[in-house]
Every structure is written in C-alpha cells, then in structure tokens.
Amino acid sequence: MAVSGISGVESMLQQMRAVVRAAQNQAATPTDLSPSAASGSFAAELQNSIRKISNAQNAAGNQAKAFEMGVPEVSLNDVMIDLQKASLGFQSAVQVRNRLVAAYKEISSMSI
C-alpha cells in the first residue's frame, strides 16, 4: 500500500529532474526569451499539474463518498491510499508555490 505512494513520489521527482535537465541543456538566446516561448511551456506544465492535483482530489473525495454510502466495490484501504496521494500532491504543489514566491521575492529585491 505504501509502496504505490512512494512510487508516485519517485515518478514526480523523476519528472522534476527531467525538467531541470532540459532547462539546463537549453542555452538562453534572445529569441528564447520572448514571452510566448518562455512562458508558454511553463504555464502549460503548471496548469497541467494543477489539473492533475485537482482531479486526484476530486477522485479521492468521490471514492470516500462512495465508501460512506456503502458501495461494496470500494474498500477503506483504497480510500485511504487515494486520500493520501491527493494530500501528497497538494502538499507538493504548495511547496512549489512557496519556492516560486521566494524566488520571485529574491529576484525582485536584486538591484539592477
């Protein structure tokens, strides 16, 4: 049961590492810094991640409601695992947000 949660975290870490490697491999050129090129992929990835987190939370909530209603196909173990996965995804998103805000504050306080 806990193994599936850990594998989810490991897959998320692998995705994050792949994004970091891709960002490090790209050389910044003036054409790469246009707003549409620079923010399009990041914004799309951020929106996709938020959508996945929202879907996981909704699915976990629906499964919890089904368990409360006594649906025989839904076990307590599955409900608890899905709720923990949704919670972990949300906590990860909050940490990413906190780091983005900290980076923004640091950049905005730099003198030109």
UniProtKB/Swiss-Prot annotation:
Alphabetically, which GO biological process terms does the record hold? bacterial-type flagellum-dependent cell motility
User: What is the designated name of this protein?
Assistant: Flagellar hook-basal body complex protein FliE
Task: Return the GO cellular component terms, semicolon-separated.
Answer: bacterial-type flagellum basal body
* Similarity field: Belongs to the FliE family.
- Claim: 4Fe-4S is one of the keywords in the record: no
Q: Subcellular location, in the record's words?
A: Bacterial flagellum basal body
Q: Which residues form a coiled coil?
A: none
Q: Which keywords describe this protein according to UniProt?
A: Bacterial flagellum
**Single GO molecular-function term?**
structural molecule activity
Transferase listed as a keyword: no
Taxonomy of origin reads: Bacteria, Pseudomonadati, Pseudomonadota, Betaproteobacteria, Burkholderiales
Q: Which Pfam families match?
A: FliE
